[in-house]
Amino acid sequence: TIQDAPDVAAEKARFFLAYQAALPATPPKPADPPKWYGPLASKIPAGLPGSSANVALTADLSAARNAFYNTYNAQVAAVAPKSDGPVFAVVPVATSAQWTGPVAATLPAGVPGSSPNVAETADVLNAKNAFFTTYNQQVAAVAPAPKV
């Protein structure tokens, strides 16, 4: 390791002495405030239907509320469109079995050198040989003479 220069070492020592002298006079860190251990605010019902009511329902209030809901539902039923057409039952689509064979990229797809799907007949082999023989003869006929 590289040692400090004498003036740097003296300044570091002076700083640490001043720091240690001031440390007892520093007030302690205040205690953290207590944490909330109750339920989350989102879990407390806020007058929603079905939650505990702030004010108990009276018989008059229950009767008025039921009358309102009955009138409301009757109005909704009166203006709802009537369906005269057939009712179709939804049938879930049957799932097919998952493919477990090789990946398509690993299967040969007519690439030269891969095994053909259908074996070539003798007629096809003869026609191919005749074509390539004629082709090679034509290429040789138009090829320039080799330079010696």
Swiss-Prot record:
The tissues where this chain's protein is expressed are given as:
Calcified shell.
Q: Kindly list the GO molecular function terms attached to this UniProt entry.
A: structural constituent of cuticle
Origin: domain of life: Eukaryota
Keywords in alphabetical order, please. Cuticle
Protein name, UniProt field: Cuticle protein CP1499
What species was this sequence derived from?
Answer: Cancer pagurus
Starting at the broadest rank, the lineage of the source organism is: Eukaryota, Metazoa, Ecdysozoa, Arthropoda, Crustacea
